[in-house]
């Protein structure tokens, strides 16, 4: 395996993080709907596995259904990561899943100002503290691999290298580190087209929000500090509306 091939695979995985979580939600029109509570409920449900009464009401689901949606989301995350790989072991799938759980549950965010735009939409400011996830994860593995003789390199499968990198990511979560300067991301909560009393957050807004919640340039092999802008070209899965 060439190190550049490993970099390309990891970069592809990194860019897929922004489209992993799909949120199902609906709301009630009028004074009963709180866009800030709705936004926090969605994030808590799919990142923290925490389900408030308000979220269950807005998503029109039971707690068991919400828990299943969380588990299904993690399964989808793993499938997205391995979609172009053959014969991925159960052990690596489990490590990927554990990695997602650790990253998501340690994301830090607060709901700030909520503005009623008087056109049926709401602007919600989310203050995020970027989680340092990928620092010193791929570099050490690359250096170690490059230091091996060609004969020894042949003994390393791509999966084994992936396992080493994921282990580094999970180890990073043992000592949490966040950027000192918080980032404010304003998203729009809007009615779902042709769905009365249902609301959703635009997929591009989710993409910007997730990009602000964690680093990425280090893991992709880019030493710059422009990771907040590095996801502009990624695509996010549109969150479906609930029935």
Model-inferred region functions:
Residues 2-10, 14:
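Positively charged n-region of N-terminal signal peptides that target proteins for export
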Residues 22-25:
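C-terminal motif of bacterial Sec signal peptides marking the signal peptidase cleavage site
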Residues 29-243:
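Mature, Sec-exported extracytoplasmic domains of Gram-positive
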Residues 17-18:
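Repetitive helical segments and hydrophobic/amphipathic motifs
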């Amino acid at each position: 395996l060439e190190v550049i091939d490993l970099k390309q695979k990891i970069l592809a995985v990194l860019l897929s993080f922004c489209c992993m979580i799909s949120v199902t939600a609906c709301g009630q029109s009028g004074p009963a709907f709180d866009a800030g509570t709705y936004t926090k409920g969605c994030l808590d449900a799919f990142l923290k596995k925490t389900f408030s009464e308000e979220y269950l009401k807005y998503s029109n689901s039971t707690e068991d259904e919400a828990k299943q949606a969380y588990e299904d989301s993690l399964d989808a995350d793993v499938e997205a990561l391995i979609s172009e790989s053959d014969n991925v072991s159960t052990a690596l799938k489990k490590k990927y899943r554990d990695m997602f759980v650790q990253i998501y549950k340690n994301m830090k965010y607060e709901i700030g100002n909520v503005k009623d735009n008087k056109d049926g939409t709401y602007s919600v400011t989310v203050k995020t503290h970027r989680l340092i996830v990928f620092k010193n994860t791929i570099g050490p593995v690359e250096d170690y691999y490059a230091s091996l003789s060609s004969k020894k390199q042949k003994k390393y499968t791509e999966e084994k290298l992936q396992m080493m990198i994921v282990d580094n990511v999970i180890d990073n979560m043992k000592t949490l580190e966040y950027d000192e300067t918080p980032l404010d991301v304003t998203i729009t909560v809007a009615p779902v087209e042709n769905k009365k009393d249902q609301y959703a957050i635009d997929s591009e807004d989710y993409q910007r929000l997730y990009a602000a919640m964690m680093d990425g340039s280090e893991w992709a092999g880019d030493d710059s500090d422009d990771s907040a802008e590095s996801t502009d070209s990624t695509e996010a899965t549109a969150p479906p509306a609930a029935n």
